[in-house]
From Swiss-Prot:
Keywords: Cytoplasm, Cytoskeleton, DNA damage, DNA repair, DNA-binding, Endonuclease, Hydrolase, Nuclease, Nucleus, Phosphoprotein. It is found in: Nucleus; Cytoplasm, Cytoskeleton, Microtubule organizing center, Spindle pole body. Residues 652-732 form the ERCC4 domain. InterPro entries: ERCC4_domain, Restrct_endonuc-II-like, RuvA_2-like, XPF, XPF_nuclease. Heterodimer composed of rad16 and swi10. One of its GO terms (biological process) is double-strand break repair via homologous recombination. This is DNA repair protein rad16. Belongs to the XPF family. Endonuclease that specifically degrades single-stranded DNA and which is involved in nucleotide excision repair of DNA damaged with UV light, bulky adducts, or cross-linking agents. Required for double strand break-induced interchromosomal gene conversion. GO terms for molecular function: 3' overhang single-stranded DNA endodeoxyribonuclease activity; damaged DNA binding; single-stranded DNA binding; single-stranded DNA endodeoxyribonuclease activity.
Length: 877
């Protein structure tokens, strides 16, 4: 049977042939049709009776691969999820064969429970291989797969080369996790790729747009603030941070603030509050840089006002201070210039204000381009089979799309400055300021005695004696924070007085009109499409739309490659690309930085591949001697009159299905535990007939203590198990500590986490609390806890907590179950009555009668829950 392949370009065919011949990892530049190649690989091996698995694909990936298969390859992709396919249906489908797109969590459970015949799997195609870690679910799947299937293939794909350079030997580590030896690297500068894309290049017109003078000033001020923040971080944390490559250019990296936070995670409990504030300020300043070229002048001013007004000292704790960058002269200058872009106060004795409403420079350039395209399209003949007159405008995000739609629907040919949509935004801005003013007045002011005391505290205790500076007149230096905040509030109040004057100007300047002067291109050509960049989906949009003109309002190197692939695939289609960017701006620097960084990443990746040691993918157990296996299985922890135990079986741990979202089951399996997935009603991990463990991350612990769920879980564990254990697990690379009592207030309240944990131990004296710094440490703790204990029975563990007549083989859909558990008067004890009482879904639960609710959860709880479902959303008086 001949297999159909749809790969029109030479580099696509070369990648396909290499992956067909050898298992390996393909690292390809983003925008070069990765999903199309993956779909053809799946189609090639999809012979009758084969079982192929697509792993690591998100919803968009599955949809695009399915479209490629159905439209060009005549194959079908089956999506596996718990909502559409039950366990029995999945088992039957696996036996029939086919191509299955399956989530890693479902696949690992099906492999452990033998629902899927591992030895019959033809192969696995993995997407986003750069996300694979040794403790993750994908690495767990590959270990289970290779334990019993030595002949099935593994093909992995990735379009993010930078991730393989994070850490030491990240590429070889990924290959080891995937049991692969070969790496196929295809950057944009690859000879075959370059030849394929340059045979039929698109007509590209670069439009270098100049920033306005006010935007240049604001950009310079923001860079000064970023530099000051980085310098302060370097000064405070030289022992913790790797600052070798720190400069303004490195701050342009899309994940720079995340990298800084990741370096500080392990010592986060030791750094000062000021350091934590500076890390957050980096994210804020980076966002302001992007907003400067994306937001209109009114929205940008509102964003700045929000930041300034949020630093009211009275809203901060006594030991906290506003962001340091807001105290800089550059920040004050930036705020003043941003306000001048919107309106200016006229000179003279009479207070007056003039609305400016500066438009973004790209807007007028976009209008000129559309005018040019409009006239050119009217005169040109179009072949409907090759292209049409549609115009495709690409933006960075949906906000910019909405902004352009508003602009194009209001601007006119005769008056480019007639931005009527800016009028409404300015009115909304003033209304927002008025609401803030009213809210500030409604807040209760502190009593005079407390206010005086606070003032004295600020002036006398705000600065240590050794740090006080002398000022003229012998007075103590006042805090700059207080004065700056007062000046900001005074300035805000002064600007509010100009509101009525500005509104009167606006009403005279922009009177509502009804006419046909609105941008006529939209009326004459209803084929102007405005989209935001959406990854691989942009290829599908280009193929379906077949535009004649593409206007890149915001720069994106990945989309440029997709346009190159589209033009090379269809060389007869007419295509012109307008590439707009702000010359000399951060936008241009970010674009050039991303292109240069990707090229450097591929170059380093090629060098690492040439120097990389050969990865051995053989089964490690083959080289393990019988003596070492014997010694490993001998339990040497003999105490309390115990006997020496020798077993050929691995230690067994029963794991709740929901726990497979975490990395602990994978680590347990890697440490020679036999992991058995099971639907547990009590506990998360069953170590023995006596020991039940409830695992909580820090975030889950806080939520469970707040809503009372942890109390119910401990109550259930205490009822059914002799040794209930609460495991509090921290992240591996984060600080292993809880907030010290010295950071708490003088009077610890009942809602503090420490107080709730104390109350929990008082309520359940038999409860054991185990603190673990990471999942690796948890695995070692489990080994110690299981010493001299019997192995648990899965059937018994699954039946614990069930009422008489209830079946333990039934499974839940987690999303509606979590919603059910969130309803009032539904507890850990009575929710099973709802599940087994004939309530099929949440809709039926909302329509259930009061009488039935009383039968399921009790008279009082049933009456209140019935009333809750019928409570009005709005509180009518």
């Amino acid at each position: 049977m001949e297999t159909k392949v749809h790969l029109p370009l030479a580099y696509q065919q070369q990648v396909f042939n290499e992956l067909i011949e050898e298992d390996g990892l393909c690292v390809i530049a983003p925008g070069l049709s990765l999903l199309q190649i993956a779909a053809n690989v799946l189609s090639y091996f999809a012979v009758p009776g084969s079982l192929l698995l697509l792993v690591g694909a998100n919803v968009d990936d599955i949809e695009l691969i399915q479209h490629e298969m159905e439209s060009h390859l005549e194959k079908k992709l089956i999506t596996v999820n718990t909502e559409t396919m039950s366990v029995d249906k999945r088992e039957k489908s696996y036996l029939e064969g086919g191509i299955f797109a399956i989530t890693s969590r479902i696949l690992v459970m099906d492999l452990l429970t033998k629902i899927i015949p591992t030895e019959k799997i033809t192969g696995i195609v993995l997407l986003h291989a750069d996300r694979v870690v040794s403790t993750g679910t994908v690495a767990f799947i590959m270990r289970l797969y290779r334990e019993t299937n030595k002949t099935g293939f593994i093909k992995a794909f990735s379009d993010d080369p930078e991730q393989f350079l994070m850490g030491i030997n990240a590429l070889s580590h990924c290959l080891r996790c995937l049991f692969l030896r070969h790496v196929f690297i295809y950057p944009r500068f690859h000879v075959v790729v370059a030849e394929s894309l340059e045979k039929s290049p698109a007509n590209v017109v670069e439009l270098n747009v100049n920033l306005s003078d006010s935007q240049k000033t604001i950009q310079s001020c923001l860079l000064t603030c970023i530099e000051s923040t980085m310098r302060e971080l370097r000064r405070l944390n030289s022992a913790y941070l790797d600052m070798e490559d720190w400069n303004i250019e490195s701050a342009l990296h899309r994940s720079f603030d995340v990298i800084v936070r990741r370096q500080l995670d392990s010592v986060w409990h030791r750094v000062s509050p000021k350091t934590k504030q500076l890390v957050g300020d980096l994210s804020t300043l980076k966002f302001l840089l992007s907003a400067l070229v994306c937001y209109d002048c009114v929205s940008f001013l509102k964003l700045l006002d929000t930041l300034v007004l949020s630093v009211n000292v009275s809203s901060y704790p006594s030991n906290a201070q506003p962001s340091p960058w807001l105290m800089l002269d550059a920040a004050n200058k930036m705020i003043r210039v941003a306000r001048d872009r919107v309106y200016k106060e006229s000179e003279g004795p009479n207070m007056d204000a003039i609305p400016i409403l500066e438009e973004q420079p790209k807007w007028s350039v976009l209008q000129d381009v559309l005018n040019e395209v409009c006239h050119e399209t009217m005169l040109a003949d179009t072949d409907a089979e090759t292209s049409n007159n549609s115009i495709m405008i690409m933006c960075a995000d949906e906000r910019t799309c909405l902004q352009l739609r508003d602009y194009l629907s209001t601007v006119t040919y005769d008056n480019k400055d007639s931005l009527k949509n800016m009028n409404s935004k300015l009115v909304d801005y003033f209304q927002w300021r008025e609401q803030y003013r009213k809210m500030s007045k409604s807040i209760k002011k502190p009593e005079p005695s407390k206010e005086r005391e606070a003032s004295n505290t600020t002036s006398r205790k705000g600065v240590p004696p050794s740090k006080r500076r002398r000022v003229r007149g012998g007075n103590n230096a006042t805090s700059r924070t207080t004065s700056d905040n007062t000046d900001a509030n005074d300035s805000f109040s002064r600007d509010l007085r100009l509101e009525k004057i500005l509104l009167s100007h606006l009403s005279k300047r922009y009177e509502p009109e009804v006419g046909n002067d609105a941008f006529e291109v939209i009326d004459d050509f209803n084929s102007i499409y405005i989209y935001s960049y959406n990854g691989e989906r942009d290829e599908l949009v280009l193929n379906n739309l077949r535009p004649r003109y593409v206007i890149m309002f915001d720069s994106d190197p990945n989309f440029i490659r997709r346009v190159e692939v589209y033009k090379a695939t269809y060389p007869k289609r007419s295509l012109r690309v307008y590439f707009m960017y702000y010359g000399g701006s951060i936008e241009e620097q970010k674009y050039l930085f991303s292109v240069r960084r990707e090229k450097d990443s591929f170059s380093r990746l090629i060098k690492e591949r040439s120097n990389m040691a050969i990865v051995l993918t053989a089964d490690s157990e083959r080289f393990e001697s019988q003596e070492s296996k014997f010694l490993r299985n001998v339990n040497t922890r003999i105490a309390g009159g115990g006997q020496l135990s020798i077993t050929n079986e691995k230690p067994r741990v029963i794991v709740d299905l929901r726990e497979f979202r975490s990395s602990l089951p994978s680590i347990l399996h890697g440490n020679n535990f036999s992991v058995i997935p099971c639907q547990l009603l009590v506990g998360d991990y069953i170590l023995s007939p006596k020991i039940c463990v409830e695992r909580k991350s820090i975030r889950d612990l806080i939520q469970s203590l707040s809503n009372g769920r942890l109390y119910s879980q401990c109550e259930a564990m205490t009822e059914y198990y002799e040794i209930p254990v609460l495991l509090i697990e921290f992240e591996q690379h984060q600080s292993f500590t809880s907030p010290p009592f010295s950071d708490l207030s003088s009077e610890i309240g009942k809602n503090d986490v420490q107080s709730k944990l104390v109350l929990l131990t008082l309520s359940f004296p038999n409860l054991r609390i185990v603190w673990s710094s990471s999942a690796y440490v948890t695995s070692i703790i489990f080994q110690d806890l299981k010493a001299m204990e019997q192995e648990p029975d899965p059937a018994s563990a699954a039946s614990i907590g069930l009422e008489a007549g209830q079946d333990s083989t039934n499974t839940y859909n987690q999303a509606p179950l979590d919603l059910l558990m969130g309803l009032p008067y539904i507890t850990m004890k009575n929710y099973r009555n709802v599940f087994y009482g004939g309530v099929k879904d949440i809709q039926e639960a909302s329509e259930t009668s009061e009488r039935k609710w009383s039968e399921l959860i009790g008279p009082e709880a049933g009456r209140r829950l019935y009333s809750f479902f019928r409570k009005q959303l709005k509180d009518y008086e």
